[in-house]
């Protein structure tokens, strides 16, 4: 197996670069089409119903039919909107979603028509920071969509999304720091190479748990889908959008889901490395086989997104903000200090660093769970001691006094 050097990218012939770009684009589109269909099937199964089963054999062409339907629908532009910003917002959301996948390694070096090339479009010395920066741009499309729509509900959805990204982008970035410390690089291909022996999910479990929570909040998915909460904001930031403009927002959402899943695979699950015991077999991590392992790991995270949507109710906005600022960020900072100390001990010649770090990771995860359980208990205690609600007969906002028939005198 050969790990690509970031300095060697950019030397492929133009047709090979074009082919790899087209391959990444097709991979994302097919993943989105499959994810939408599989999500609807899983939700149907969990809700004891069939799900889509009419278009094509067993409903396999439902996503394609939905795409054609959206393309043929009339594109309405509401009166009073800022037209150019209104039309540009979906484009601003969807383009960064595709750009982030440019530095994700899908496999090792392979031979394509006699040319040796990495299954990766490009790489940078700060590739992970590039992904963090590019994915942050997508929120501008959501905020502009809410502002340009000229309606209160989309505006509130856009503001919620901006606050959500600010809060959880910090926790997500802090979860990367421990990976940088252990890998010694910010290059995605370098991080994958550093996990040749031990995956970082075992060494850096608290960082993985923080990232797992942050990626759900970053993508505005249930139970953190507050910018488009139907019960509060109708449709949120895309209430006034229809036709292909709405389809672009949906495409951006599912591409972002795929991107954060691929990044989790790259940082914590060994990237394209085969899982044990498959990795023992000769050739499991060479040629085109790693693309299969990478895709399977990405789908594992996509199923996690779907499972959360089917099982958990939406959180309140104050609970969501409290989770990010009062739990995830402090835990990340404490964990970074532990990892940096352990790494310094290793550099000083300490030999049992792997076992020690795994033990510390377990202790830190237990402490984080205890803190979360204690906070939940305190909140329940406060709720149980709250004063009883006033009888509706006497009137209490928002219920006016109700007419009550006086009992007849005995």
Curated annotation (Swiss-Prot):
Catalytic function, reaction form: a quinone + NADH + 5 H(+)(in) = a quinol + NAD(+) + 4 H(+)(out)
InterPro entries: NADH_UbQ_OxRdtase_su1/FPO, NADH_UbQ_OxRdtase_su1_CS
UniProt GO MF annotations: NADH dehydrogenase activity; oxidoreductase activity, acting on NAD(P)H, quinone or similar compound as acceptor; quinone binding
Keyword list, A-Z: Cell membrane, Membrane, NAD, Quinone, Translocase, Transmembrane, Transmembrane helix
One of the GO BP terms on file: aerobic respiration
Membrane topology classification: Multi-pass membrane protein
The EC number(s) this enzyme carries: 7.1.1.-
Pfam families (alphabetical): NADHdh
Role summary: NDH-1 shuttles electrons from NADH, via FMN and iron-sulfur (Fe-S) centers, to quinones in the respiratory chain. The immediate electron acceptor for the enzyme in this species is believed to be menaquinone. Couples the redox reaction to proton translocation (for every two electrons transferred, four hydrogen ions are translocated across the cytoplasmic membrane), and thus conserves the redox energy in a proton gradient.
Family designation: Belongs to the complex I subunit 1 family.
Protein's recorded name: NADH-quinone oxidoreductase subunit H
